[in-house]
Every structure is written in C-alpha cells, then in structure tokens.
C-alpha cells in the first residue's frame, strides 16, 4: 500500500530522534494522515505478511467488551501478553470503554451499540464517535489506548471511518490498526445496509523505533502486490453476532513476514 510506504519514507526523511517511555528510542514526527478507499480492496499490507488471526480476534475481543486475555489465548493470540497481569487482566482498556464507559453519575454507556443505532437512524449526525481514551481510567490501564477515538460519516450510501491514533508504532502497530478499523467499518456497514467508503487514519506521534529501522528499509524495497478482498458472512445483521468464521480474506498473497521486537 503506497500510503503506508509513504508514511515510512516521510518519517525516515523528516522525523526527529526522540527518547520514549520504553527506552528504545524513536524517529518521530507529529501529525500525519492516510486515506484508504475501501472499495479498492481490503487494506492489508502486501509487502510483508500480517497475522490476520491476531487482527480479527483482537477486534472481536474488543467488541465483546472483554479486558482479560483469556479469549485471546483460547484463540492462540498472544499480542497482549506483555501487558497483562498474572491473572490475564489489563484493566479498563478498549473493550471496557467501547462497551461500558462509566459516567460520573454511575451509569454505563455502550458506545458501540449507540453509534450503530445513530448510523441507522440519524446518519447525518456529526456525533457518531467512540472514545477509548478515558482520562478517569488511564491510570488503571495496563496500556492507555493508542487508538484513542474514531468517528463515522455517512454520505451517498457509504460508511467512512476516521481514527485518531495518539501514538503510532509504524512498523508493528499501524498495519494492524489499519486492517482492524477497515474490518470494523465493513462489519458496521453491513449491519446498517451501507456500502463502505474511506478509512481515514490520522496519527499523532508517528514513530519508528530505532530497532525497527533495518526492517522498515527492507520493506521499502519490496514491490506492491494486489490488495486482497474481504468477504463477510452476509447472513450476519447484528454486529455482535460476527465470529471469526464469518470473516474471510480472499486473494492475500503477501511477501514474507518481517520479524521485529515489540517495545513494551
């Protein structure tokens, strides 16, 4: 995907060296935006193989409202292991905020259900947002949300999504985030009887870790291949009824995976 390669090139050329929380060090820039037309194919990187099982199960786990890694482990997904405590708990991370945000007066808000209902009943609304970054809960989270909030937009029968990501690990995290939110947009579009439009990805601190530079430069040498297609089970009309078996990627022919260490 040219948009993603352009991001890597821009940060390598114009980024600044910065220290970071993990002690690894980064090349970073502030403020960057990419746009993917979801009609043109599913935005899954072809210049390195991505582990789609992890991407899809993580999204389903968020949608379940869960914050313990048991579901992930049951499905052979280990991407959250470094942050979980000895009981597998992560604190009030994405699933909690998406499905049961706690208000000051003791109520809980199911943001995902609310936004789907808004899309169906009031598609011209400018309030179709879901927020994961809850300042009142940040100190209780194993890792505060990197993908902080997202907004939907309906025009000409198409559903678009824009994500604001406060912290963007370009080599390891961003490819997962692109695919995850593209999948979510497809799923919500289906249950709302809409086509898909664009996925707009807005990054705050966009960074390449210093121990990912060799891998990023290797990836830039690889030729793009055609994007795959996403096929969802058309019988599913409720967002929370989707399972892993309802998601199929067709025609994914990527270059080999490129290993890199995650910064914790």
UniProtKB/Swiss-Prot annotation:
| Gene Ontology BP annotations | dTMP biosynthetic process; dTTP biosynthetic process; methylation
- Give the pathway annotation: Pyrimidine metabolism; dTTP biosynthesis
Q: Subunit structure, briefly?
A: Homodimer.
Q: What is this protein called?
A: Thymidylate synthase
In terms of superkingdom, the source organism counts as Bacteria
Q: Give the gene name.
A: thyA
Keywords in alphabetical order: Cytoplasm, Methyltransferase, Nucleotide biosynthesis, Transferase
EC numbers listed for it are 2.1.1.45
Q: Where does (6R)-5,10-methylene-5,6,7,8-tetrahydrofolate bind?
A: 51, 169, 263
- What InterPro entries would the database entry show? Thymidate_synth/dCMP_Mease, Thymidate_synth/dCMP_Mease_dom, Thymidate_synth/dCMP_Mease_sf, Thymidylate_synthase, Thymidylate_synthase_AS
Main subcellular localization, coarse class? cytoplasm
Name of the top EC class for this enzyme: transferase
Q: Per UniProt, what is one GO molecular function of this protein?
A: thymidylate synthase activity
- Catalytic residues (UniProt): 146
What the record says about family reads: Belongs to the thymidylate synthase family. Bacterial-type ThyA subfamily.
Q: Which organism is it from?
A: Bdellovibrio bacteriovorus (strain ATCC 15356 / DSM 50701 / NCIMB 9529 / HD100)
Chain positions recorded as dUMP binding sites: 21, 126-127, 166-169, 177, 207-209
